[in-house]
Amino acid sequence: MKTASCFGPAHILLPGENIPLEKWGCVACDQFTSDRAYWEQADAVVGGCPSTLRLILPEVYLEDEDAARRVENIHAAMDEYSRDVLTRAVDGFVYVERTEQSGRVRQGLVGKIDLEAYSYEKGARPAIRPSERTVTERIPPRMAVRRGAALETPHVMMLADDPGCTLVEPIGAHKSELKKLYEGELMQGGGHIAGWAVEDPAMLAQIDAAQAALGSQEAFDARYPQARGAKPLTLAVGDGNHSLAAAKACWEELKATLTPEERESHPARWCLAEVCNVHSPAIEIEPIHRVLFNVDCGAVLLALIAWSDSNMAGICFGDSKQQAFTLAGPHVSNVLSFEDPVAPLTVGTVDEFIEYFMARHSEARVDYVHDEPAVRALTRQGGVAFLLPPFEKSDLFKGIVMGGVLPRKTFSMGHAEEKRYYIECRRIKE
């Protein structure tokens, strides 16, 4: 299964058919980060059944005193599942169809990406790039789980700029020829999912050729004429940016201890991920809103006005068609607009203010929530929210190519329940 491409086939592990899918799969660890009740309910749903919930550390628990013990339990579960639970394997890709709440079907290919073809360093131009700024302080807690882990299970979703639908969609057109691996409902409103094994050599070659064409200099120059001659971009990280960065950091750490020959084949060099086509109608790019906690809405508004007056032309009430957003608190909600803003995107200007505000209010805490009803619920509990305008997905790749990265947590793909659920696993320890 050797390939020179940055995304290739893998030895993918799955649980035995006796394990219920609705208990095995759980949502990405970086969802519901302010909602412990969600994760407590997930724990109740799983009970004593094997589940990927036991292989991850939900971020809601990252700062708890027992986080280290949780990591130990995760590693122990990985060893147990390697022996007794993950009894099926695919040598290739898994073609996935996820039916979203809207009824649209999101198609994807699960395979491994080469971490040598990826970097989150500022200014780097590898074939695989983050879509948003990577906050290095967020990497170590994720490294603690991956370091020493026997297995990985992915919630990383990669995006291909494939307007001709050459990579993922042709596999879906022939799914009747493939062996179905799983199908069923996902827990807690996750919807329906099905997966098929892609192991046929001709199909593997087809995927490799399509990917090579997408990542060619000729295709890159045609798609982005303003960046003609620059290093081509093949895949961008859609979801799971910091988890992928942690995998890269762990690989660099391990690589330093390996011989050149060992570096060529060690399983930790790769990371399992799902690749989707950004042009799919089922891919929705939604803004991620900001919510401040332990603050007073009136104080935030006064500070915002003062900061805007000092750093730009000010702020006005109503939509001025420049950078409009909604500031919402427990009892108030106002549309505001930055005048002569300091950043190209509304999210960038809002982030600059939040950074300024939090530097002066040590009690303040910020969370990033992409579901507007969830944001409104948090404001009723005392949070102060910055609700951001829609983000056009057509600008995503152009923004990465021309600007390097977008501001941190600019966008999200779908609602929280529609995020990738952990199902497939891969061994990363020799």
Go through each PLM region and give its residues.
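Structural beta-strand/beta-sheet cores of well-ordered domains, especially the beta-sheet scaffolds
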Residues: 51-53, 154-156, 233, 268-274, ...
